[in-house]
């Protein structure tokens, strides 16, 4: 699964306008609604924010992966929000989250997001990529970083 197949420019909010965790989740859901992927956001927003109370999506190191299933989703869908200031997502390391990757899966494949998040996490572990994502000023820069990383990964796989 390629990240660039899901994270196109219209799926990247940079900068995210939200100042709170709840606002960030709503802003990301609204973007999916704007793209005609979702017809409504209020129930999903309530479900995700309720889930966050018991199972925070913050993974530490400045990133959060909120996720939920929806009957409106046929396949994995996602949107990435980037906050220069960072948002409090109750991260285990206490750091604010600068990258919020919201994923939605179909109810038939509720765990379909795991491969995608794992791939994103591997990419984010690369210090150059992480720095580039955090310093980017336009969604196009983000998609270029993702494409370059995936191209490099493909070359590495060919050499192995």
Task: List where the protein language model places each region.
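Cytosolic covalent-transfer regions centered on His/Cys nucleophiles
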Residues: 1-160
């Amino acid at each position: 699964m390629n990240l660039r197949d899901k994270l196109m420019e219209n799926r990247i909010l940079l900068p995210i306008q939200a100042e709170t965790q709840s606002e960030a989740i709503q802003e990301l859901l609204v973007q999916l609604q704007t793209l005609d992927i979702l017809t409504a956001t209020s129930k999903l927003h309530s479900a995700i924010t309720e889930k966050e109370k018991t199972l925070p999506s913050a993974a530490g190191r400045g990133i959060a992966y909120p996720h939920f299933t929806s009957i409106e989703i046929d396949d994995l869908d996602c949107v990435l929000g980037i906050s220069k200031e960072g948002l409090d997502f109750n991260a285990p390391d206490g750091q604010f989250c600068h990258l919020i990757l919201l994923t939605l899966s179909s109810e038939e494949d509720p765990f379909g997001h795991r491969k995608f998040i794992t791939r994103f996490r591997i990419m984010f572990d690369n210090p150059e990529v992480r720095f580039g994502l955090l310093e980017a000023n336009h969604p196009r820069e983000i998609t270029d970083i993702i494409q370059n990383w995936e191209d490099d990964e493909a070359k590495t796989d060919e050499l192995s």
